[in-house]
Amino acid sequence: MAVSLPLVFTAPRRGMPPKHLADLDSTERREAVKELGLPGFRADQLARQYYARLEADPEKMTDLPAAVREQVGAALFPTLLTAVKHLACDGGDTRKTLWKANDGTLLESVLMRYPDRATLCISSQAGCGMACPFCATGQGGLQRNLSTAEIVDQVRAAAAALRDGDVHGGPGRLSNVVFMGMGEPLANYKRVVAAVRRITSPAPDGLGLSQRSVTVSTVGLAPAIRKLADEDLSVTLAVSLHTPDDELRDTLVPVNNRWSVAEVLDAARYYADKSGRRVSIEYALIRDVNDQPWRADMLGKKLRKALGPLVHVNLIPLNPTPGSEWDASPKPVEKEFVRRVLAQGVSCTVRDTRGQEIAAACGQLAAEN
């Protein structure tokens, strides 16, 4: 088993990146523009360039006077993320991007194209403090929180790449965003919620994706799940449960020592009731660890009792990580697990695994240069 790491809820005190337009709400944008000595209407103009035209370089904003572009760039459009490299697999349909922030911090995002949609998996932190032993990100520890703009800019860059046909499959449109990359989103709560609002608000306030096409994942920070429910968003909540019993979950998902399975499912039910959305339960199936028939039965019973019809189980065949002695359950075991969960009246499917050979799959992101 991997070395046990401490839980880290508060990010190390490292300098955050300079303010960016995407950090600001509409009122703050207008104030920032006026501080530059520009008329107020420029605020919406700049926001439309960024959110609607997906343009992050003021030098290319032709409706902005050339004389002020450099000033605007320095004040509102600092370069936050630089692509270090792209890796592709699955016939080019999966592309992982390694980003370097302006302080040298590394993070990753993964773009996945399907026949009917394009999904971007984004990071909310550099590293992760939740210390799950089967996850490469968790084993690397937490470096720092990402800013709202660093989160949003991952999405803008992917949307622009799809629009411009820079990825395999020709021009397309970004349809889904999942906060399932590096980090525990609810441990960077304020910035993640602000990013969700930027991603889903229509221009000039955001990128205009449907809230229902955005998924926010968590290992189970129960109070933060309840807080998210009270934001009155309709994003999908995904809970990384991985086992239905506290004894094993205390090890697999160390945050369980703080909030038990029952507390997490109770918070998830509150979210489902408030949002009207079905909660997704993520379950990485690990050979001889959490794949026993009795655990499938227990999972189905607990979920049916806690969430009724407002739940769906995503089984994830464990993706290999360096140094781990664990591997995925055999297909017959996986099939029987699904059958048993379904027999309890709970929806359950096996997730299509993408990006394994480029370490872009669930639990593999380690931001290695």
Swiss-Prot record:
UniProt keyword Metal-binding present: yes
Catalytically driven reaction(s): adenosine(2503) in 23S rRNA + 2 reduced [2Fe-2S]-[ferredoxin] + 2 S-adenosyl-L-methionine = 2-methyladenosine(2503) in 23S rRNA + 5'-deoxyadenosine + L-methionine + 2 oxidized [2Fe-2S]-[ferredoxin] + S-adenosyl-L-homocysteine; adenosine(37) in tRNA + 2 reduced [2Fe-2S]-[ferredoxin] + 2 S-adenosyl-L-methionine = 2-methyladenosine(37) in tRNA + 5'-deoxyadenosine + L-methionine + 2 oxidized [2Fe-2S]-[ferredoxin] + S-adenosyl-L-homocysteine
Radical SAM core domain sequence ranges: 114-351
Primary subcellular site in the record, as a coarse category: cytoplasm
GO BP term, pick one: tRNA methylation
Residues that, per the record, bind S-adenosyl-L-methionine: G183, E184, S217, S240, L241, H242, N319
Catalytic-site annotation from UniProt: E108, C362
One of the record's GO cellular component terms: cytoplasm
Residues binding [4Fe-4S] cluster: C128, C132, C135
UniProt gene name: rlmN
Protease recorded as keyword: no
Family: Belongs to the radical SAM superfamily. RlmN family.
Summary of the function given for this chain in its UniProt record: Specifically methylates position 2 of adenine 2503 in 23S rRNA and position 2 of adenine 37 in tRNAs.
UniProt-listed Enzyme Commission number(s): 2.1.1.192
Paired cysteines (S-S): C121-C362
Subcellular location: Cytoplasm
Other facts: Reaction proceeds by a ping-pong mechanism involving intermediate methylation of a conserved cysteine residue.
Pfam families named in the record: Radical_SAM
Protein name: Probable dual-specificity RNA methyltransferase RlmN
Cleavable signal peptide: none
InterPro entries: Aldolase_TIM, Methyltransferase_A, RNA_MTrfase_RlmN, rRNA_lsu_MTrfase_RlmN/Cfr, rSAM
